[in-house]
Amino acid sequence: MDYKVKDLSLAEQGKKQIEWAEIHMPALMEIRKQFEKEKPLQGLRISAVLHVTKETAVLVKTLKIGGATVALAGSNPLSTQDDVAAALVEEGIRVFAWRGETEKDYYDNIKEILKYEPQIIMDDGGDLHAYVHENMPQLKLFGGTEETTTGVIRLKAMEEQGVLRYPVIAVNNAFTKYLFDNRIGTGQSTIDGILRATNILIAGKVAVVAGYGWVGRGIAQRLRGMGARVIVVEVSPLRALEAVMDGFDVMPMSKAAELGEIFITATGNINVIRKEHILKMKDGAILANSGHFNVEIDVKGLKEMAKSSRLIRPNLEEYELPNGKRIYLLAEGRLVNLAAAEGHPSEVMDLSFSNQALSVKYIYENRGKLENKVYNVPQEIDETVAKLKLNGMGIEIEPMTQEQIEYMKQWRYGT
């Protein structure tokens, strides 16, 4: 079996990490039991570009137990957990991923997992989907899935331009994904990454959050909960209004740059923090990114104008500006929660990856019946995931009476 990981001797530690995740992912483990019994993915070939974490390992093992053959590459050069990658190889998964990949390594690994002629592809960020469309028109795919807001935006653009060649389920758009993974998971793991990289006190700091989507609001809420004074930067009047009504200050980055001590980007867009903003910042300002790609902070511009730079501690680099101020960049401007920490807690990835597993099953069962467009996760899958999670937490919900069911179907009775 082909694979390329950093060190197979790390496999034993990786297995322990995966076991720890499995304990905290009851919904996906219940799906695994069903997959083991029914083998709904028998004969299916899957290639996936996902963050190679212990939680992803639980998903990939579940797909394999369901009958699929899986090849896996990492979706970020700094997010792979090398012990987990080694453990997955021993589980019979073709893994091409290691922490610290170059850009060439990253795309070479994507090429490797596509050699197995997948029938379904799974992506986190849209790079795999884009690569297939640009370089492998011969692939005959039943469909694909996409985990992130960034990837869904790219896929919707492909659909609108008429170039999308297969159906894709936007796992990101499931209620049981974005309400928990994007908001709660990213909120917690982003703060975790910042603290691991800096060990600073959050209380009393002025924090600037760029973007008030589900990710941004989760980060802003947790910063406030830890005692920070939070400023939100938004381009959408609707989200800006929501941030104001949630009690946050809202202003352009040009003004926030002079006030902030911690800056976190979560927009999915490019050059949100630019050179003109950085020059206005206070001495000692900290820059972190929680968007998918390392383009939200103008890292190139920062490096070009810096007089000098030095690594202070892992994932914390100091840049001295011509004006004498020092700016601190976390994790090279890449995903701070995965590069400087371990990503989302297993409990929240339980929801996202349950949606992934059931979406793959749905695509396989409906192959040839779906149009070449971006679909939301079917409501029945979303509700199934919520029920499985509640069951795993030992929580019961109130059932409706027959009278209530009938009342919800009628229109005659009012005041």
Swiss-Prot record:
Annotated binding of substrate, by residue: T53, D124, E147, K177, D181
Pfam families: AdoHcyase (PF05221), AdoHcyase_NAD (PF00670)
An example Gene Ontology biological process: one-carbon metabolic process
An annotated GO cellular component: cytosol
Highest taxon, organism lineage: Archaea
Cofactor mode of binding and number, as noted: Binds 1 NAD(+) per subunit.
UniProt similarity note: Belongs to the adenosylhomocysteinase family.
Protein name: Adenosylhomocysteinase
Native source organism of the sequence: Sulfurisphaera tokodaii (strain DSM 16993 / JCM 10545 / NBRC 100140 / 7) (Sulfolobus tokodaii)
Cofactors, names only: NAD(+)
Pathway named in the protein's UniProt entry: Amino-acid biosynthesis; L-homocysteine biosynthesis; L-homocysteine from S-adenosyl-L-homocysteine: step 1/1
Broad class of the protein's primary localization: cytoplasm
UniProt keywords, alphabetically: Cytoplasm, Hydrolase, NAD, One-carbon metabolism
Matches recorded under InterPro entries: Adenosylhomocyst_ase-like_sf, Adenosylhomocysteinase-like, Ado_hCys_hydrolase_NAD-bd, NAD(P)-bd_dom_sf, S-Ado-L-homoCys_hydrolase_CS
Positions contributing to NAD(+) binding: 148-150, 182, 211-216, 234, 269, 290-292, 337
Compartment(s) where it occurs, according to its Swiss-Prot or TrEMBL record: Cytoplasm
Record EC number: 3.13.2.1
Reaction(s) catalysed (UniProt annotation): S-adenosyl-L-homocysteine + H2O = L-homocysteine + adenosine
GO MF terms, alphabetically ordered: adenosylhomocysteinase activity
Gene that encodes it: ahcY
PROSITE patterns: ADOHCYASE_1, ADOHCYASE_2
SUPFAM superfamilies reported for this sequence: Formate/glycerate dehydrogenase catalytic domain-like, NAD(P)-binding Rossmann-fold domains
Origin organism lineage: Archaea, Thermoproteota, Thermoprotei, Sulfolobales, Sulfolobaceae
Function in brief: May play a key role in the regulation of the intracellular concentration of adenosylhomocysteine.
